């Protein structure tokens, strides 16, 4: 067992480590510079290069302290070397720049695709269409240490005053010779509504939640030793799924948005299609990328100075007064109907598994009784139990004397599973009525009398009275023959037992042949008239054995039928009282099991065995304890109480967990099913509602009051 626990603990630790590494890698992958530089070559930073970088950063910090033309100092750029700064990233790429309005003598921002980098201002004149760039990573922006063969080591040999001057240079050759000035108003983080547009739809989190539901289900059917581990795993999966769906984004996950002011213009030909027209709008040298559904509304801002918020990848988040992704999500929330569908389907799956694999009757009853506050009842008499007022969910501890029940209408056979058949000691009849008398039967007495008469004559004993002298009997025995010395008695006892014509047919025919009579009725008349008194019949041993077997087979049905009838006659308890039953079929009496089941006895022995069993079980001590699962009163006034064994602590938790899981799955399936339907309907009309909203904002309809028309 310890090996299994160690293995599970190691597996859990490895899983947590793998998740942590995956999160670290995904966090690195979410950084804007990682995807841009991941295919670049790298090398180690040389000591002289590091010295040049440190000197440049020192001079940069000194220059930033010098007030500008308006008397304000430049905003400090915190470039600090870190452990990753020892690796130089080498790549060939174009450099994009745009201007800002600031007191900083360096009025340009430089980008490699969507990654902003810090370029020493004295290298602006060396920018080409494709640039050989070497840079290192700092705590804030990547720092360019070499551009097209120019390095910071050369800068150390030149005048320090020249280093950060506003050098007169030509425009970057990437976008042409001239570009319009763009004013950088602000740099902000995207709002939660804007972040929601790039956030996944939550399908992965929905699958995690469904996986947690399945783990909770398997907790109900696995051994106790694994349950804590599975519950812990299910809680972790559920927490991870809910956190992914509802947790606010971290600050590091929110991307930067640059708030710009400039004049957007369209550069293109008249023959371009709609998609090309929406993608050929520029703000200065920045090519803007608009949402597709903004196409009808962006033309009114062309050629006019407009406030535009963009991501570093040039996607527009806001333009003008009305076009805003933030307002879209706020007024028309995203409808993630797919994740609700997945959770609803998963909940239904677990619910069906509960219905088909786990009995739900007992968990529901136990949970409801536990919530209602069930009572514990101890009783040793019928009156005590009557006063207690038994309800479903109560715990009973009963002891006393009662009768094992006999089911009505049952077919008593050897295949029945009760060791006390025909009595069922998993059900006890408990009342104050006097015990029933032992059953009696005239037919059984007649059958036994016939069997005894034949047996006495076929197997005589020396002390038995006989109408034949001892010497004659001895001579007959020596000859090998068998003597019936009272044949008339056998005929009369057979007629008394088998009164109907269709009963004991073979035995009657045999006796007719032995009596040398015309038919059975004639033979009976002769016997009644005393004409068979003193008639002796000699039989060969084979004939004697056949006669004995015929008597046995003829009397057996009478005895078996009377045994069953007598058992049914005992199934008539007095009105009132209780019938205490174990719904698991457990025996409620402490009696030794019979060595041989009743119906395994020969027919001639069943009656005596039944009487012994009845004498023991009609008034026998019993003890019963358990939780009441059902209570009802029959037409005879007997109160039927079904008991289930008292579960242990683990069983209680399983019952409670089964009920809670079933209720949770029902609520989850209904709620998420309704949400999926409603969200799907809203998702289909969301884009049309957004366009209608923009139409009402950009092209308002004026309604004229009828009073103004007068």
From Swiss-Prot:
Question: Which regions of this chain are Periplasmic-facing, per the record's topological domains?
Answer: 1, 361-656
Cited InterPro entries: IgaA
Q: What is its main location?
A: membrane
Q: Does the keyword Transmembrane helix apply?
A: yes
> What membrane topology does the annotation report for this chain?
Multi-pass membrane protein
Entry's Gene Ontology cellular component terms: plasma membrane
Question: Coiled-coil regions in this chain?
Answer: none
- Which loops or segments lie on the Cytoplasmic side of the membrane, by the record? 23-204, 247-339, 678-710
| Places the protein is found | Cell inner membrane
**Record keywords:** Cell inner membrane, Cell membrane, Membrane, Transmembrane, Transmembrane helix
Segments spanning the bilayer are 2-22, 205-225, 226-246, 340-360, 657-677
Q: Which superkingdom?
A: Bacteria
One short Pfam name that applies is IgaA
Family, per the entry? Answer: Belongs to the IgaA family.
Protein name from the UniProt record: Putative membrane protein IgaA homolog
Natural source organism:
Salmonella typhi
Q: What is the lineage of its organism?
A: Bacteria, Pseudomonadati, Pseudomonadota, Gammaproteobacteria, Enterobacterales
Gene of origin?
A: yrfF
